[in-house]
Design a protein with these regions (language model features):
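Short, small-residue-biased leader/transition segments that mark boundaries at the very start
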Residues: 1-2
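Flexible loop/turn connectors
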Residues: 5-109
Length: 109
């Protein structure tokens, strides 16, 4: 599916020079489609994903990605859930939570 979506994007935007995918898995399909279209990832077109999957570092070129800190996400989710339980299930006011991330630059950019 992801490969087909990238193929369709290349038809609509033949001069495309960069793609950021919602996950690393989507980026893997995009990378395959780009290669099959004769595009050189990291040279003709930059490609990045989100999630920092181990497979991304094994690709050639390595997949640039955004790394989120899952432990921090889990801790914050647990804290909010416990707070809701203490308040008898009330979600209370809408709150904004800012979590850390790291951009991992690899050869696909």
């Amino acid at each position: 599916v992801y490969k087909r979506q990238m193929q369709e994007l290349l038809v609509r935007c033949p001069d495309l020079d960069g793609v950021v995918c919602v996950t690393d898995t989507v980026a893997f399909g995009a990378m395959r489609a780009l290669r099959e279209a004769g595009r050189h990832v990291g040279q003709d077109v930059g490609l990045a994903g989100v999630g920092d999957s181990w497979a991304g570092s094994m690709m050639e070129p390595g997949l640039a990605t955004v790394r989120f800190y899952q432990k921090q996400v889990g801790q914050e989710a647990a804290r909010i859930l416990l707070q809701m339980l203490e308040e008898n299930g009330s979600s209370g006011p809408v709150r904004q939570v800012t979590l850390g991330y790291q951009i991992v630059e690899r050869g696909s950019l």
